[in-house]
């Protein structure tokens, strides 16, 4: 059995984000000046946390964000950054490079909601969820192999993480801590899978519209996993959400504009 924290961060802003254009997987854009500032602010916010593992989408905007976060970290600058294509953004097919309004118009013409619509050549929601499930499987395996001897106690059903609005909320007594840097649509689909399919426990008072809202650039979420092996299968026996889409660190970016 192993208990570990997973902190999820969306990449910083790109010019395509600013211009409300879809990037998906086919358009590999760098961070904008604001995106660099956002990533640095996230790095300063998380600077005192020790990330034992780091997993990053292999798209440029995510890699740059992770590099900046780790560059600001006091304990994790030497942690290996694993680039994983499973963490890429949802593929939007023919809609990539087009305005988001174009995707909405395509969905309306097809008689579907924008969230459920798959443009030609794009990934379905189920395909993206399958990628996240594959990532979780490899994550559980790696964490148990590397940290299976770490001392950790499983939180009880009655345990609720202390949420004080601090960067280490929920992770104070969890020595194994992974950082994942990915993308907006991918994170949104992943969180929905954790909550709806895997029965992730949520903090008291958190409303569902907050849980499933779009993640802002460098928005931060945290989950505590307890995993163990049943025969030859690794599974999570408990998942506790600590916070979702936190953006406190972005205040300093706004104030500097």
Swiss-Prot record:
InterPro entries: His_Pase_superF_clade-1, His_PPase_superfam, PG/BPGM_mutase_AS, Phosphoglycerate_Mutase. GO terms for biological process: apoptotic process; autophagy; negative regulation of glycolytic process; regulation of pentose-phosphate shunt. Its EC number is 3.1.3.46. It holds the Pfam family His_Phos_1. The active site is at residues 11, 89. Fructose-bisphosphatase hydrolyzing fructose-2,6-bisphosphate as well as fructose-1,6-bisphosphate. Acts as a negative regulator of glycolysis by lowering intracellular levels of fructose-2,6-bisphosphate in a p53/TP53-dependent manner, resulting in the pentose phosphate pathway (PPP) activation and NADPH production. Contributes to the generation of reduced glutathione to cause a decrease in intracellular reactive oxygen species (ROS) content, correlating with its ability to protect cells from oxidative or metabolic stress-induced cell death. May play a role in mitophagy inhibition. This is Fructose-2,6-bisphosphatase TIGAR B.
């Amino acid at each position: 059995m192993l208990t570990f924290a997973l902190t999820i961060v969306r990449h910083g802003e790109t010019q395509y984000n600013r211009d409300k254009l879809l990037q998906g997987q086919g358009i590999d854009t760098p961070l904008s000046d604001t995106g660099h500032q956002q990533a640095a602010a996230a790095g300063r916010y998380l600077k005192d946390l020790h990330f034992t593992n780091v997993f990053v989408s292999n798209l440029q905007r995510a890699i740059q964000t992770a590099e900046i976060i780790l560059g600001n970290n006091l304990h994790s600058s030497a942690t290996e950054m694993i680039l994983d294509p499973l963490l890429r953004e949802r593929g939007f097919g023919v809609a990539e490079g087009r305005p988001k309004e174009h995707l909405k118009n395509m969905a309306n013409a097809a008689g579907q909601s924008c969230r459920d619509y798959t443009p030609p050549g794009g990934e379905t929601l189920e395909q993206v969820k399958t990628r996240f499930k594959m990532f979780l499987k490899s994550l559980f395996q790696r964490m148990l192999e590397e940290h299976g001897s770490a001392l950790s106690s499983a939180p009880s059903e009655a345990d609720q993480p202390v949420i004080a609005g601090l960067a280490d909320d929920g992770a104070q007594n969890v020595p194994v801590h992974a950082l994942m840097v990915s993308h907006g649509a991918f994170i949104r689909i992943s969180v929905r899978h954790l909550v709806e399919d895997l029965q992730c426990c949520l903090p008291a008072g958190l409303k569902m519209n907050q849980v499933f809202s779009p993640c802002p650039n460098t928005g931060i979420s945290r989950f505590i996993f307890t995993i163990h092996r049943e025969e030859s299968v690794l599974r999570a026996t408990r998942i506790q959400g600590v916070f979702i889409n936190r953006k406190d660190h972005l205040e300093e970016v706004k104030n500097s504009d």
